[in-house]
Amino acid sequence: MTQITLLTPDDWHLHFRDGDMLQETVPATARLFQRAIVMPNLLPPVTDAKMVTEYRERILAARPAGSTFEPLMTIFLTNNTTEQDIIDAKAAGVVAAKLYPAGATTNSDAAVKALDALFPVFEAMAKHGMLLLVHGEVTESHIDIFDREAMFIERYLARIVAAFPTLKVVFEHITTKDAADFVMSAADNVAATITPQHLLLNRNDLLVGGVRPHNFCLPVLKRSTHQEALRAAVATGSSKFFLGTDSAPHEKHRKESACGCAGCYSAWSALELYAQVFDDLGALDKLEGFASKHGPDFYGLPRNTSTVTLVKEKWTVPSEIILPNGNPIVPFFAGEEINWKVKTA
């Protein structure tokens, strides 16, 4: 197959950041994606309806002229979140609330420390039809970073899912066989997003031959057996798995430093990279479901009706992009050749 046409995809997990960065990130995503679930981990985090509304306006202002791209907004759960916060957020158009264990990712220090205390909030979310998006890692310092996802399932996620059978839960950016197996065996109210980097890479690509800071993300890349389990999961065509890039930009100097930031900025190449994965797996016929159908179906939103076409044509990801402030950012797969390209008129 040398050409494939898909319903226009959506990105069910990304980070736009804020300020000048929006002038880069919003157009990059709006290029191909009709909608995107926008993460709320700003400084300070987006915790209520007023902050959501203001952030959404800043995103809309950064859209290219004529764009119909729609940001789907989320709020950041803390131990101070109340049922009224959920009601107000829902009224403001928020579709989901994000659970970050404190310290699990960029700007998550304000996040949840005592998870059981949030059970009344989860109950309110189920009642009001708001989805729960989960960064599924424990954060205790003595637990090995490669084991934190599996431990979270065992300690917390299994209990949340069992306690709230009507709450829709998205296990975000899964990285392990444990997570893929959990989602596959769970009831229909549980789904997962998978990033391009976790399908394309494993921890050798982070650490062998030198540290590769632009492949560093959280949850961290795992061993190849986990990568293969994720690839096998998407190749099944199961509606429980859908596209979420976790595109997460940091300026070059913040990645290439003594304490580099976590995140892969994949917005400029994500759909093409997913196509490459599905092609390698002999499962191109499953790409449209993963990219364009399973996400809106799970969220209870209409599928897009427009289309995008990819052609099998090699191109090279730019080595860097200059941000509006003049600083460079290194995109995911910088300088690498990709086999699929978006067909332009």
Curated annotation (Swiss-Prot):
Catalytic site: D246
Residue positions where N6-carboxylysine is found in the record: K98
The protein, known as: Dihydroorotase
Cofactor note: Binds 2 Zn(2+) ions per subunit.
Name of the coding gene: pyrC
Function: Catalyzes the reversible cyclization of carbamoyl aspartate to dihydroorotate.
Enzyme class of the recorded protein, top EC level: hydrolase
Recorded catalytic activity of this chain's protein: (S)-dihydroorotate + H2O = N-carbamoyl-L-aspartate + H(+)
Biological process (GO), any one: 'de novo' pyrimidine nucleobase biosynthetic process
Binding site for substrate: H15, F16, R17, N41, H135, L218, H250, A262
Subunit structure: Homodimer.
Listed HAMAP family: PyrC_classII (MF_00219)
EC identifiers of the protein: 3.5.2.3
One MF term in the entry's GO annotations: zinc ion binding
Pathway assignment: Pyrimidine metabolism; UMP biosynthesis via de novo pathway; (S)-dihydroorotate from bicarbonate: step 3/3
Positions that bind Zn(2+) 2: K98, H135, H173
Segments crossing the lipid bilayer: none
Cofactor(s) for this UniProt protein: Zn(2+)
Family named by the database record: Belongs to the metallo-dependent hydrolases superfamily. DHOase family. Class II DHOase subfamily.
Lineage summary: Bacteria, Pseudomonadati, Pseudomonadota, Gammaproteobacteria, Alteromonadales
